[in-house]
């Protein structure tokens, strides 16, 4: 269970120079011949900023701008141009002007330097809800040069192609910059002094980011060298976090669910290459052809074309049951071809867990069968005594209370309301666990 997709958008990056008037011929000049990428490939802007051109996208160079268009070719676009400007705000403003757009400013947020960029700033804009578009901007600086990224993208495309956008943004690097690699290098032994450095860093970050409590575990050479907590379990109370404090582990649950399936495969009770519908006839998607293609291994590959579609469990989760989750999954239509894109799906992961539970305990209630399978095949063998899907048990004794920001951006103790919505889809992200228990899982891996 990851955070919901939030305004991740296609971007239009424009190179800007304060020494010259902005006249990037993005739309006015005749477009040169476009080239479509047959596979992900490295690419550069005229000034050498590097990025990955995603498979199926079209690249055009127009003056000092690079225009990237997704396969849908519906007007969504990405333009990247390296620039020189006095500030991030100036660079972004001139970039929008060059595109002939003037979106209504909403918020600017600074991000930490990384990947060779000395300054990063992102911008959100107020877009009419019915426009169903994602509009945002990002400015990246190295020295006096800027790369500005502007987004004006259809919301559906932004969601469907989020993995491609992520790859493009995460591989956007300044000209000449080479990421550090640890290949072929040996890690220093984590002696007492280095472990104290780690502890000091974690504690400082915890304070800087107003995190009430955190627990951390480290394994080196197969041995646990750190398992401890920092801060408190609940604001306003003295009880400290330790290695046995239970936290919700969200989508880390998926890895444990997959381990349960693997144990069934090892036992000869399940086949990765069996059709999911043959294993459990109640499995359905909204598209019969896609349903027919889904094998057990595809339930957890995020490759079937089924979109994220989290609103059902977020708005109706407390009313849902495991059975209704599978019923809802049966209405979901794929938005991309089978195997075409990585599209994260919590309902598909939930189906994987519930199908595994039925293989282990045929005829049981979906949730109960899954819970029993996880206990018998994962938690008990690994000695994960504090890992559970029992929310009453989890919130007794040593556990981390939920916290969040109030309207004044102050961290406060919050209710469990939103967290409870995942219970009906629990194979995707509802387990509670501890650092000590998760270290046992990591040691097994």
Regions found by a protein language model. Name each.
Residues 223, 227-230, 234, 287-445:
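Short, surface-exposed loop or secondary-structure junction motifs
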Residues 190-191, 195-249, 269-271, 278-279, ...:
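Short, conserved catalytic-motif segment at the N-terminal edge
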Residues 208-215, 237-299, 334-347, 426-429:
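Short active-site loop at a secondary-structure junction
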Residues 20-34:
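Signal peptide processing junction and immediate N-terminal pro/mature segment
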Residues 9-21:
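Bacterial N-terminal signal peptides
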Residues 54, 65, 89-96, 162-169, ...:
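Extracytoplasmic/secreted envelope proteins and their assembly/folding machinery
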Residues 32-34, 57, 145-189, 193:
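Surface-exposed amphipathic alpha-helical segments
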Residues 34-39, 47, 59-157:
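Conserved polar/disulfide-associated segments of primarily extracytoplasmic proteins
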